[in-house]
Curated annotation (Swiss-Prot):
The lineage of its organism: Bacteria, Pseudomonadati, Pseudomonadota, Alphaproteobacteria, Sphingomonadales. Keywords: Cytoplasm, Methylation, Protein biosynthesis. One of its GO terms (molecular function) is translation release factor activity, codon specific. It comes from Rhizorhabdus wittichii (strain DSM 6014 / CCUG 31198 / JCM 15750 / NBRC 105917 / EY 4224 / RW1). It is found in: Cytoplasm. It comes from the Bacteria. InterPro entries: PCRF (IPR005139), Pep_chain_release_fac_I (IPR000352), Pep_chain_release_fac_I_sf (IPR045853), Prokaryotic/Mito_RF (IPR050057), RF-1 (IPR004373). Peptide chain release factor 1 directs the termination of translation in response to the peptide chain termination codons UAG and UAA. The keyword Protein biosynthesis applies. HAMAP family: Rel_fac_1 (MF_00093). Belongs to the prokaryotic/mitochondrial release factor family. Methylated by PrmC. Methylation increases the termination efficiency of RF1. This is Peptide chain release factor 1.
Amino acid sequence: MAGITSARIAQIEARRDELQALMARGDLPSDQFVQLSKDYAEIEPVAQAAGEVRRLRAELDVLKGMAEDEAGDAELRAMAIEEAEEIRARLPEAERALALKLLPRDAADERSAMLEIRAGTGGDEAALFAGDLFRMYQRYAEDRGWRVELISASAADLGGYKEVVASVTGAGVFARLKFESGVHRVQRVPVTESGGRIHTSAATVAVLPEAEEVDVHIDDKDLRIDVYRSSGPGGQSVNTTDSAVRITHLPTGLVVIQQDEKSQHKNKAKALKVLRTRLYEMERERLASERAGARKSMVGSGDRSERIRTYNFPQGRVTDHRINLTLHRLSEILEGPGLDDLVGALIAEDEAERLAQLDG
């Protein structure tokens, strides 16, 4: 485990023991006990992984001693040699599991996420593709037991979306979807193409960790809230009351418009949720760039202008350009469950990059 110091592991184990003693006292206020329990749940897996590595190493030392004891029983020596080989095979995986648990965690990983998809170059075909992507993420979410709530949608004339925003709620949503941010490109024959020519279109995906009220404080004086009547395709009014809401955050200039609900109150609540999430992401980006002279990750830059993936319909393939992975299972991926293989490969690549940095 090059680069992993025993001092850090000892510090974690000492903190684990301290937390156990504190929680056993029985006289703590409930809020303090809850916080200590969270701290314990975070470091206990690290301590367990360290204990497993230590146990395997100690067992290997004993077995090596038995195998090298020429005065010992020949049958016992043979058994010791065999068991030592088994432990040598298990030890690297145990060490890697410990190393992964020691990596710095993204505090947002366990959060729910805001998913935003916008049609890019390609007109009607790009909007249809944006709809395909949204359905892919919906099905993927359903497969994992997450809840998807539509926040806003701007439908296109031939189907699909010019823009769609949804909240995806569940444990660890952001951790699995954060590498989806970027430009997704599609190559296929559009429904409007009579000559059978393949066109290239694109849609942009942004995945943001959802913010809670405690994360972002918004002063009322920093907001300008305008209300007006909702409008449908072509600009015609679809509501007789002023239910649509436009919120402008004056310090940053961020503008959020929400008109999908018939209730002004519901539209305002949804708009504030989107605004809070975008402000939280701005702060995350600021802190990351401050820390960052740091890691230029091939996988996790999160740059929304970066072309990350191509969906080629004639060849039935999906290629993720960040890790040079091509899967000839386009239909299965667009159906949702097949997306997990891409997501898993991206997470594994990110872990490998961070482990290499830890060892370096």
